[in-house]
Amino acid sequence: MRRASRDYTKYLRGSEEMGGGPGAPHEGPLHAPPPPAPHQPPAASRSMFVALLGLGLGQVVCSVALFFYFRAQMDPNRISEDGTHCIYRILRLHENADFQDTTLESQDTKLIPDSCRRIKQAFQGAVQKELQHIVGSQHIRAEKAMVDGSWLDLAKRSKLEAQPFAHLTINATDIPSGSHKVSLSSWYHDRGWAKISNMTFSNGKLIVNQDGFYYLYANICFRHHETSGDLATEYLQLMVYVTKTSIKIPSSHTLMKGGSTKYWSGNSEFHFYSINVGGFFKLRSGEEISIEVSNPSLLDPDQDATYFGAFKVRDID
């Protein structure tokens, strides 16, 4: 009895494990459902794709082939063997022939066939055309350079001629006497080293005609020799003043001055003293430049000793 009871109990446990508990319907062992099969494209779609791919590859191959074909046809270095042979014969013929046109023409007729003669004519025409182009371009460049150079020289000459300048030297025939400060009004502007251009000299003053920056300079020499007589005093103030006078706005300004007090004793046979001043100044049209000195009777009258001048450096921005 006990053995039969144990067997029955095992049977019930086995039914619970397989059926999920008492009362559960018996469905047999559980398995995962198989995955669905992938969707296969229709045969017509695959054929269309393969055809399009083939057409695309064919078009690429044809394009590449045409590119290399035309490149080979347009290659300037592509010369046939016959053409090379003709050119070689022509060059050999001209090397061995005399420098007479009649000899060359007769040998061309006898030794060069018609096909090579056509190549020669085409080659000569191309060379002649290229030479004409080179000679013509060089001729045009030479003419252009000549024209440009002429205009440039003319412009330079015109600019130099129009550049204002003046160099004035002392007129020894009209030098004031005395020891006091005086204005020097007697200058040469067209004699010896004196010259003036595009500026005006009037009443002992240099008049500016063009606005601009000018360099002004003055060199004044004083001298005395014992044969000229005794000096009134042994202590002398030897000075020079460069003055600017404006007419539009009445005014006068000293631009530069220089000098010194000297002791000229009667024990010396000869005395000499030189003053030089210079500088850049902005001047307007109509302004006047003049020179003032002390002890004018002691001025050195040589043109390389007493002078003043001006020249324009640049325009006013």
Curated annotation (Swiss-Prot):
One of its GO terms (biological process) is positive regulation of canonical NF-kappaB signal transduction. The record marks H139, I140 as: Cleavage. One of its GO terms (molecular function) is tumor necrosis factor receptor binding. Residues 164-313 form the THD domain. The chain crosses the membrane at residues 48-68. Induction: Up-regulated by T-cell receptor stimulation. InterPro entries: TNF_dom, TNF_ligand_10/11, Tumour_necrosis_fac-like_dom. Residues 31-41 have a biased composition (Pro residues). SUPFAM superfamilies: TNF-like. The keyword Secreted applies. Highest in the peripheral lymph nodes, weak in spleen, peripheral blood Leukocytes, bone marrow, heart, placenta, skeletal muscle, stomach and thyroid. One of its GO terms (cellular component) is plasma membrane. Residues 1-43 are annotated as: Disordered. Belongs to the tumor necrosis factor family. Homotrimer. Interacts with TNFRSF11B. Interacts with TNFRSF11A. Interacts with FBN1 (via N-terminal domain) in a Ca(+2)-dependent manner. Interacts with TNFAIP6 (via both Link and CUB domains). It is linked to Osteopetrosis, autosomal recessive 2: A rare genetic disease characterized by abnormally dense bone, due to defective resorption of immature bone. Osteopetrosis occurs in two forms: a severe autosomal recessive form occurring in utero, infancy, or childhood, and a benign autosomal dominant form occurring in adolescence or adulthood. Recessive osteopetrosis commonly manifests in early infancy with macrocephaly, feeding difficulties, evolving blindness and deafness, bone marrow failure, severe anemia, and hepatosplenomegaly. This is Tumor necrosis factor ligand superfamily member 11.
